[in-house]
C-alpha cells in the first residue's frame, strides 16, 4: 500500500489576522488573492503604485481598503501580516520598514528574498531581531506533485535518493522589472527548481553550472538558459535544465504558427527502492492543468501508483506559504519556508550564477553569509 500523500497543507482555523498586500500585479490578482480567499484568510487592505489597478483588484476580490502609500498600509493597525509582492530590487526596503511596525507580526516575502546573499542575510537578521515571522513564498514546494514527491522521499518509500532531475522547456511569465537585474534566469526562475531540489535532497555541497544568453529574447542579460549539476557528499546528484525561451515560441508574441510549440516541465526522482516522476502544470496557465505524479517502489511490488487531484499550482499552491506563516503565528512549528532556511536557497542561486560565469565548480557554503 502506498504512503498517504499530503499534497496540500491544511490552513489553520480562523479567525485569521488581517493581511495587507503590497503590490497588485497579475500574480497577486490571479494567484495570491484567489488562493487566500479559498483558504478563508482575511485580506483587508491593498496598495499598488498604480492606484487604478489597485482599486480594480480590490473591487474584484472584495478588499475594503486601498492605501495611497505602502507606508500607510504598514501603519494600518488592522494589518498584522504583510504580503510583500513587489520586484526583488524593491523588496528589501519594504521588509526593513515593516520591521519597525510593532503591530506587524508576520511578513511573507516573494522569491527571491533578495538578489544576493548579503542582502538576504540582512533581511533575515532584521526580522529576527524585530520578532517578525518571515516566510519566503517559494510556492513550488506547495505544488501538489512536488509536495507529494517530498512525502515519498521523506517516508523512505523510494529508499535512499540517487538522482533527481527537473527539465523545463517553457516560457515563464516574464515581467518588465526582470530586465536589468544582476541575474535573470538564476534568481527569478531557477530559484524555484533549486529550492525544490533542496526540499527533496537537502542543500548540495557543490555546483557545476553552464549558462548562456538566449538569442530568442530581446533585452540584454547574462544568464538565459541554465544547466546545472548539484553534487552531494552523501551521494545523490541532481540535474536541472531551465530552457526559458523554449523554441519555437517567441517571448513577446503569440505562438509562432509556422512551427507549433510544446511547452513542458518534467521531473523524476530515483532512489534505491523506487522512482517517482511527473509533470508540472503551470505552462498551461491560465487553463487549470493539475501537475501529475506517478511512482513505484519495491515496497509495493508490481504496482505503479498514479494519484491525481483537481488542485493546481497557479493559484491553489499559493495558500501554502501563507498557511505556514499563520500556523507559526498560532504557536505551531517553524515554517519550512522560513527566512533563515531560505538563505541556503539564495546561496545556492549565487553558487549557480558564479559557476556559470567562471566555468568552474562552486562550493555552496562559500556563499552562505557568516552570521
Name each model-derived stretch.
Residues 1-15, 81-83, 324-371:
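C-terminal helix-rich "cap/oligomerization" subdomain common to oxidoreductases
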Residues 27, 49-50, 310-323, 340:
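Active-site loop of classical SDR/Rossmann-like NAD(P)-dependent oxidoreductases
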Residues 2-61:
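N-terminal Rossmann-like dinucleotide-binding module
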Residues 50, 61-126:
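Beta-loop-alpha module in the N-terminal Rossmann-like domain of NAD(P)-dependent dehydrogenases
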Residues 125-132, 147-161, 268-271:
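Basic phosphate/pyrophosphate-binding loop/patch that engages nucleotide-derived ligands
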Residues 28, 67, 107-109, 134-136, ...:
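Hydrophobic residues in well-ordered beta-strands that form the structural core
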Residues 2-5, 188-285, 319-333, 350, ...:
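Contiguous beta-strand/loop segments that form the cofactor/metal-binding neighborhood of enzyme cores
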Residues 140-228, 359:
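Predominantly a Rossmann-like dinucleotide-binding segment in NAD(P)-dependent oxidoreductases
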